[in-house]
Amino acid sequence: MSKPRIKLKLPDNADKLLLHSCCAPCSGEVMETLLYSGIDYSIFFYNPNIHPVKEYLIRKEENIRFAEKHNIPFIDCDYDTDNWFERAKGMENEPEKGIRCTMCFDMRFERAALYAYENGFKVFSSSLGISRWKNMEQINDCGIRAASHYPDIHYWDYNWRKNGGATRMLEISKREEFYQQEYCGCVYSLRDTNRWRMSQGRDRIQLGVKFYSASDPD
């Protein structure tokens, strides 16, 4: 059983938050904590890294489903894959948590910061950091760097994993029976994950078939 939630306050006395969301499993706990805290927020979905398009659409639709359940505005941004692949050139064989991931976070947060600036959000954050598979310092550095390009825009680097957040993330995913992605998102992550699985005698990832269930072990 997870710890009880604590109520949060936005930094800089901000009145609303732009939350970049990578997927429903990662954002579910963040969204419910923000609701519990009485924080006004909107979901910003900009993830041109997610490939192939079948996987992208499944992850986006799961996020939309959960946002609609809680009546949260959902900002569906351009898929923008051509720009992502252009920026990833030369980094195709970089490891997870390396410079390709930094580029990817930079690209997504640059767009989030621009949207925040143009639409009256003084603060933005992301659900990316709640995942134990991610380097939180790397993510926060990218968010802070993106915010620095605009006056009076702040990246909220709250640690969503703490105070039971990581445990509740899994509990919500099971309760909602979210789609359970098995790789980060980009084709290079899919390639490398499949290589590892095959080296362990496991089958390749099958897209669109695995979902969380209340009967899953903790």
Swiss-Prot record:
Presence of the UniProt keyword Oxidoreductase in the record: yes
Pfam families: QueH
The UniProt record lists the keyword Methyltransferase: no
Keyword vocabulary terms for this entry: 4Fe-4S, Disulfide bond, Iron, Iron-sulfur, Metal-binding, Oxidoreductase, Queuosine biosynthesis, Redox-active center, tRNA processing
Entry's EC annotation: 1.17.99.6
Consequences of knocking out this gene: Queuosine is observed in queG or queH single mutants, but queG-queH double mutants accumulate epoxyqueuosine and lack queuosine.
Catalytic activity line of the entry: epoxyqueuosine(34) in tRNA + AH2 = queuosine(34) in tRNA + A + H2O
Biological process according to GO: queuosine biosynthetic process; tRNA modification
Enzyme class: oxidoreductase
Residues holding [4Fe-4S] cluster: 22-23, 101, 104
GO MF annotations in UniProt: 4 iron, 4 sulfur cluster binding; epoxyqueuosine reductase activity; metal ion binding
Similarity comment: Belongs to the QueH family.
Function statement: Catalyzes the conversion of epoxyqueuosine (oQ) to queuosine (Q), which is a hypermodified base found in the wobble positions of tRNA(Asp), tRNA(Asn), tRNA(His) and tRNA(Tyr).
Protein name per Swiss-Prot or TrEMBL: Epoxyqueuosine reductase QueH
